[in-house]
A protein has these predicted regions:
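Hydrophobic helix-rich structural segments at or within alpha/beta enzyme and signaling domains
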Residues: 8, 20, 24-174
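A conserved signal-transducing helical linker
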Residues: 13-21
Length: 174
């Protein structure tokens, strides 16, 4: 019985990870090829409320461009442990030099609290790494997720440039 339980649990984790990878690939596809947004929107219907709010957070870690795949995966796991339970559909992945968190229908104040606590936990768990967070604007409808991503990208770039821990796009004065 125990062996069957372990096998079932392992398969469940494997399927969950495979589904997470597929979802992250769909988002990456939209970020690199915005024309596919309608096609991807249909594919995400089961996992996300595509008519709801989307908000993107980018996490930059100094020297992350030096990480190999194993180190990146280890850091990704550490970062995920630093998040509180996120009470909404979300995805978390590495893309184009940043860890990307995309939340769906999460109140912006809740997201800000979660990212603030995550930052504090990360400082304790990974004291040798300096991290920067850029938080994009909450956007209605999946079609606008790329705009939240671009705004998060601008915010994290500013955070890195001026050595700030966290910047919300709305507070940039742009």
């Amino acid at each position: 019985h125990m062996a069957d339980l372990i096998k079932d649990f392992s398969m469940r984790c494997l399927y969950s990870q495979r589904e997470d990878n597929q979802i992250s690939k769909l988002f990456q596809n939209v970020f690199t090829t915005p024309q596919v947004v309608e096609e991807v929107r249909q594919q995400l219907l089961g996992a996300f409320d595509v008519d709801g709010f989307f908000q993107v957070v980018l996490i930059g870690i100094e020297d992350s461009d030096q990480f190999d795949a194993i180190e990146r995966r280890r850091v990704s796991f550490q970062l995920e442990l630093c998040f509180e339970k996120i009470q909404s559909p979300y995805t978390f992945f590495w893309f184009d030099g940043y860890f990307v968190l995309i939340v769906n229908n999460l109140d912006p104040d809740s997201l800000e609290k979660i990212t603030d606590k995550m930052y504090k936990r990360t400082k304790k768990r990974m004291p040798s790494r300096f991290i920067h967070l850029g938080i994009g604007t909450p956007m209605t409808d999946f079609r606008q997720v790329i705009l939240s991503y671009k705004r998060a990208r601008a915010a994290v770039a500013m955070a890195e440039q001026f050595k700030y821990p966290m910047i919300l796009f709305e507070e940039m004065g742009v």
